């Protein structure tokens, strides 16, 4: 940051004596930014009161305020900006009623913060570093030639102090603006994750990737120029060693080296912090969607299916196989009665009969478990049972078995909070996720 020769008590007393105060509402800030942009478009940098009123009229329309009091509110806003030293007002007996306004350094600084500093890019950083490299190169060559104190102040100290140092401060301020932008992106991601998940995930990926790419590109630019700049500063530092009268140059070199180190170091640290945040967001999404330990999404899905006809919804499927429509629209219904007997393998078998058979099987397993203290592996039970039935009945069979398994007992791993693995139970890709039942 810029150095100051004043102490904290001196600055505090100076501020108190002049009664400095800053207070800008959203409307007043928009007015100041509009004035700054309009001022940049003028060659003389001077504005009349009528110009400011026209600008305020546009601001008032944007904020949907009353048009009847524009003149009064415009004068109040102009006077407030003058009072807070954002604008300077000039008038004389020759220009009575036609005051001239110019932005003060404070007005330029505030508007520059909101306008120019947000235009931070790798191209701008590259141009700034190129200018710095040229200035330091000329200063190092002048230092090696040597001269009296006036020569050093003019050819070495001045370029480093008023060009290189100010560009370093500009880069440092831009980094702080990017810090603020990262916080804004984090808030935006947090808001997205509380809304529509389908849109949120895609938007989060885009924001994370864009920010990571920007940080990496800017840091690569800094790293490429950092070593060269440090070597040039060391050349100048070597030239002032042993010259006590050039202490001001040596102190400036130390300050510049510290600034450059701080800029490069914080750039890398910002990347590391963002990578950690990126991983945290992805871990949160995976945990919330894939693991779902509390079965919150599963419960909501069951409720949505149950109330589908009252509240219809769309189902998004990722990498789904093509669904085959088995209906033949050209076929007509046959109203003839079916005569004869069905083959034995096609005869209807009610779920009640299946339920009784499976209950008997589970009871035999229960007796074996109680007699021999043998754990029941639910995946093996399902695999063995499903082999005895056609694929069309697998879902009902599995549902009945699982229902009985819940009544049989508990798994110690469930009590320990261990997450079970998925295991295949048929040749068509069906899987089950359950621990071995070992506590009756």
Swiss-Prot record:
Residues 208-236 are annotated as: Leucine-zipper. It comes from Histophilus somni (strain 129Pt) (Haemophilus somnus). SUPFAM superfamilies: MukF C-terminal domain-like, Winged helix' DNA-binding domain. Involved in chromosome condensation, segregation and cell cycle progression. May participate in facilitating chromosome segregation by condensation DNA from both sides of a centrally located replisome during cell division. Not required for mini-F plasmid partitioning. Probably acts via its interaction with MukB and MukE. Overexpression results in anucleate cells. It has a calcium binding activity. It is found in: Cytoplasm, Nucleoid. InterPro entries: Chromosome_partition_MukF (IPR005582), MukF_C (IPR033441), MukF_C_sf (IPR038198), MukF_M (IPR033440), MukF_M_sp (IPR036141), MukF_WHTH (IPR033439), WH-like_DNA-bd_sf (IPR036388), WH_DNA-bd_sf (IPR036390). The gene is mukF. Pfam families: KicB, MukF_C, MukF_M. Its main location: cytoplasm. GO terms for cellular component: cytoplasm; nucleoid. Belongs to the MukF family. Gene3D superfamilies: Chromosome partition protein MukF, middle domain (1.20.58.590), MukF, C-terminal domain (1.10.225.40), Winged helix-like DNA-binding domain superfamily/Winged helix DNA-binding domain (1.10.10.10). GO terms for molecular function: calcium ion binding. One of its GO terms (biological process) is chromosome segregation. This is Chromosome partition protein MukF. Keywords: Calcium, Cell cycle, Cell division, Chromosome partition, Cytoplasm, DNA condensation. Interacts, and probably forms a ternary complex, with MukE and MukB via its C-terminal region. The complex formation is stimulated by calcium or magnesium. It is required for an interaction between MukE and MukB.
